[in-house]
Amino acid sequence: MLSGPHPSPTFRPNPCPWPCLHSLWMEISPTQLCFLSPGPSPQSPSCCFQGMNSGSELGKLWRKLFKGIPRLSVSHFDFYCGTCVLLGRPQIPQGSSLGNDIDQYPVVFRNASDQGSWMQLEMLLRKLSDLVWTSDALSDKILEDGLVP
């Protein structure tokens, strides 16, 4: 069961010219994630890390991913806004009647944790671009560049 009231995901304005995907982390705290979708991109995605703890494991992972993606690839993408659900504990929905609330979002991160390794983060984007990223798909490029310890 959730320890507090179930927060309602909402879009938040972002002054960054690269809108970011905002998400709610059940039982933890709101967080901000950036995702790529097709389109022209006029500048660096680094502004999307505003407000994110630069020392966090998630922040470090995003920086490694962007270093591992060829610059040409990044220049052909734009960031877009959306709402997703991060499930820190997959057993939370069982018996909680939150299944329908969770299923309405195009992106759901299961077994997400604020502790431990974010290197296994799997991103499933089914809205707008149908772009699918997995840690496996990027691992070769990241390892080639020596970005993963």
Swiss-Prot record:
GO terms for cellular component: membrane. GO terms for biological process: ganglioside biosynthetic process via lactosylceramide; protein glycosylation; sialylation. InterPro entries: Beta-gal_alpha2-3_sialyltrans, GT29-like_sf. Transmembrane segments: none annotated. GO terms for molecular function: beta-galactoside (CMP) alpha-2,3-sialyltransferase activity. This is Uncharacterized protein C20orf173.
